[in-house]
């Protein structure tokens, strides 16, 4: 039964492309549209936190200068439907949430926060690559082996 449900979700074309308040586009599966519209309100204090690992804090302190911070965004795409995007930024928008730990800051817009609340941001350094990653995301059903894309829980 689960396999047939997964197949029907995969077979459905992405029907809705919703303009985000920030001007970016996010593709959403039709059944998720209602769920995210009803549950993506601004989180209350203590709800929807993003945790930073020690290695994330350390790396951010090494690479950021002045008012720079790490921006985490969720976009439609990747092999699992959604993907994480990391960038350094200096502008905090009205709909952004700022998560600070040990002097390092990660900023997430309210639309993306619905997809990553409760997750952990880490910095991983390996022989073949070094990157920021989202770990232990309670909103993600599964991810791909690259670690940059995921599908959301329905």
From Swiss-Prot:
Binding of Fe cation occurs at 79, 144, 146
Q: Gene3D superfamilies from the xrefs?
A: HesB-like domain
Q: Which keywords belong to this entry?
A: Iron, Iron-sulfur, Metal-binding, Mitochondrion, Transit peptide
SUPFAM superfamilies listed in its UniProt record = HesB-like domain
Write one Pfam family the protein is assigned to: Fe-S_biosyn
**Where, per UniProt, does this protein localize?**
Mitochondrion
Which terms does the record give in the GO molecular function aspect? identical protein binding; iron-sulfur cluster binding; metal ion binding
What role is this protein assigned? Answer: Involved in the maturation of mitochondrial 4Fe-4S proteins functioning late in the iron-sulfur cluster assembly pathway. May be involved in the binding of an intermediate of Fe/S cluster assembly.
What do we know about how this protein assembles, alone or with others?
Heterotetramer; forms a dimer of dimers with IBA57. Interacts with [2Fe-2S]-ISCA2 forming the heterodimer [2Fe- 2S]-ISCA2-IBA57 complex; [2Fe-2S] cluster binding is absolutely required to promote the complex formation.
State what protein this is by name.
Iron-sulfur cluster assembly 2 homolog, mitochondrial
Q: What is the lineage of its organism?
A: Eukaryota, Metazoa, Chordata, Craniata, Vertebrata
- This chain is encoded by the gene named Isca2
